[in-house]
């Protein structure tokens, strides 16, 4: 878009810089919020107490946080206090503030739906609490956790004001999130639509259509992944489970066969044979 003016036709310019900027910001935000959000949800479920209730209260309050407040917080902390430039990284941090409570609350609900019988079976086999979380709870709730992450991504991909405050606006392509302004699809839509030229307004509606398509695609993927409840396996997972069951059966069969071969019948001793002969004599 840096070589296209307001009066140029729609065949010139494009929104590649906005698409790549959006993907880069969302990727950085996901790298931050996925481990932090899932860890908070696991902590609230596995370690009940005053601090877990405090974390739940904060996460619930953050869901009603205006996006402009998140943008101002990152702008004041990273740009004004720490001296960072306006960049895609700062915008990703602001977006992560908006995504984090969504992922925490959705993951908390999903982890609560994991059947307690699965955890009790793991404890009965001798597994500890965190080993049960890693090998039983999280794999069982994997589809729900993926849905929570996708819903949080759909929330963050449509934020405008945090990006405007922390990343600025540019018409040039910038793939370096550490320096220089970077634009997203919502911010590009806002900048295009506020222009008085019909061509720029048309560009804004086209950018909004691309953004709507991305959000709709995310919701479709979330619906497909979230169609299964916790513990309900997909076809590929059922095939893997059947394969592992056959392997376990073969391994236990070989073990029992080796044990039976190692145990040989002991011949009777001489003293016992003599006693038997003595008993048989008249």
Where are these regions (language model features)?
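Interhelical loop and adjacent transmembrane-helix boundary motif
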Residues: 3-9, 13, 163-213
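Alpha-helical membrane-interface segments at transmembrane helix boundaries
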Residues: 12-24, 28, 52-65, 75, ...
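Hydrophobic alpha-helical transmembrane segments of multipass integral membrane proteins
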Residues: 20, 24-32, 36, 40, ...
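Transmembrane-helix boundary motif in ABC transporter permease subunits
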Residues: 29-59, 72, 223-231
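Transmembrane alpha-helices
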Residues: 30, 106, 129-166
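Generic hydrophobic transmembrane alpha-helix motif, especially the helices
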Residues: 60-97
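Glycine/proline-centered hinge or cleavage motifs at structural transition points of membrane proteins
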Residues: 66, 125-126, 139
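C-terminal transmembrane helix and the adjacent membrane-cytosol boundary/short C-terminal tail
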Residues: 108-112, 123, 191-259, 267
